[in-house]
């Protein structure tokens, strides 16, 4: 069997990665490509990375419809730095009778002799080099010849030139230039948006403290205790579902920031700032606290992340097709530790960590049952959301 290992951080994986793997499969008559997702590589700044689980998820999404391509997770679960020679020593022991190859970019080849124990790698695998557009082929061929003189094993060029797009460009420009998204599998693009990866906004513990103090001044004591419960539950759910935890906590802290103002003020804020008010919201102005909270999030508390604002806006009614943060805040608001009157809370609290969509649906189901007993309070958005997640549970969405 002829197998090839394609190593990298894949932060994120993009279409040229898949194209290179496909070109190598065809050119060298390979049987299998394994994307070896790096854990803690010695040459990367870990501050630039995202949760390992997110990188793994994106690789799985990118390759799930690609025949002959699979994933190797050994480095993700290894403690300490991820040195390639360790992985290739293991792989060779696992496949003693197989021909093993290693795909690397042309930039990596130029420094291969400076890697830790490159001679071990070359003893275990032949090196396949992926050139990029703009490479000086004379320099690249000289580097290949030098490596051949220094190490055992073969070094060969893949007959494919990658466009030279670096993953760092996607990370930096994802929200600024939609053209870079054309280099991504649509499922990977959707995952990045849903998990708020590479966001220009980041938060730290100082932001948590600042906004917590603001809420302590703005809210009644019982509402503030509830807010802390939602924030900590959102943090926990974010860790479970691979969403930036501090971002989720900020959304939890601010979700009720307009809860303790008067109905008259909520209506006035909406009318002054052209925030649409539906008939039922005029009838029950407390329903506006999400919309007003989303406005205050930016105008009063200097939090400009659109995902946070949207999660605050829909945290009471939900909406069809909620993103991940929407669901985290919607659920956290319902199941936080201070809640004790809703039905089947123990089941919901468990379900939130097993299947978030299922938990959302169960909450909507209980909410609709309550509203059916109080039909004058029915909000059409809640009904639309319930119907959407009912279809989702049936596999029709």
Positions of predicted regions on the chain:
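Histidine-centered active-site/metal-ligand motif
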Residues: 14-17, 43, 226, 255, ...
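Residues at secondary-structure transition points
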Residues: 49-54, 78-82, 221, 225, ...
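N-terminal leader/targeting helix
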Residues: 81-91, 95-98, 257-289, 375-385, ...
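Charged phosphate-binding loop/patch that engages nucleotide di/tri-phosphates or the phosphate backbone
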Residues: 179-208, 369-397
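Divalent metal-dependent catalytic cores for phosphoryl transfer on phosphate-bearing substrates
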Residues: 213-217, 235, 239-362
